[in-house]
């Protein structure tokens, strides 16, 4: 699909554009406190004018109708919602109620989203909104703005800052990992590692990672896997999937030659496998917007840099146990509490050798034991790879009733087999008495044959003696 980055928040001052279009402030406000954005040096649309609103709405519909865009990501929505965004005292004008909310822009966004959804119900509307404005993805009839998703700027900033730290120091910043789950269900969020994070001397995702080249790759595999197992929809900026080393420059092509290196090719293949795993497991996306789709097992292991949690659907058998190790330490026989007794099998490991990792993992299925851990009655012991995400599937054990049923089935099957073939090679359908009768009959015949032979021998001997006497 194609999602357009659409900017209804402001426009440049270039005189060949919309600025002073007919020699007057046609699209912008006349008052610079309302029509100028000092933070970016741009002009702000006058959302109070019907002509301006119609122009913008028609433009959005044009992209969807004529170019079949699958969605629109609206840039800088926060700057539209607040009259004082990026401004100092005296640089902005309050609304009719004396507040800093831009009432005209709010009404414009609601109107736009309402019309757009009627025309293109399957297209996505995404807001890049960086504040705590309520109900950005709320329904229009519930005083919401009507967007499908909100860019999770908080997660993006916190997570990238956390990953920049050497694993030795990550424990002190553990809250940057866990805080996103405090507000994860307040909106319908989209997790994006976008162009904003790889421009303006911020470096690429690869250069943000600490350590040696091998550790950078391990950190990238960890980061992308964590993004996939975290609640919310996902977006990754181009080039980061194979470890682009330079930061993004719109005037240059991506460094495709990096794919000639084994490590970068392995990362690309890893991303393909990660996406396939995501699509194959509904627990990673089905209840993204519902609290019941996520459950902490242990989110407080800050000293070990560990996060352990569950992803769920409404089916118990779809449950996934996720273990994220943000340290560069390998843990042997690490005990973890599990939600149910049963079997746990490692289904995905970001540190697999095929992806360029160390290969530390759990090839054998783990059977839970009744040993309390993490405030749960059952637990398993696993081997944790350094800088990794490991995901385990769950299979319920056979219950007592099921075991008895299985045993009865085996007994019945055995009896049927004996009835068909006969026990210990006996003819099928023969009773014990019948078998004895057959044996007795054989014995009688043998005795009769022996008796006949003895009689014949006696007669011959007698005849021989009589001939000799004569």
Where are the language model's segments positioned?
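Residue-level preference for long, well-ordered alpha-helices that form the structural scaffold
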Residues: 49-52, 56, 97-105, 212, ...
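Alpha-helical packing segments of well-folded alpha/beta enzyme cores
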Residues: 52, 56-63, 108, 112, ...
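Substrate-binding/active-site clefts of carbohydrate-active enzymes
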Residues: 1-100
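Flexible, active-site-proximal loop/turn residues at the rims of small-molecule/cofactor binding pockets
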Residues: 78, 131, 396
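Carbohydrate-interacting/catalytic domains
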Residues: 171, 214-217, 226-236, 240-470
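Conserved alpha/beta catalytic core and glycan-binding cleft of carbohydrate-active enzymes
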Residues: 68-70, 85-251, 279-351, 358-359
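Hydrophobic alpha-helical segments, principally membrane-spanning helices and signal/leader peptides
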Residues: 34, 44, 60, 177-179, ...
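Short, flexible active-site loop motifs that bind/organize anionic cofactors or intermediates
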Residues: 42, 210, 377
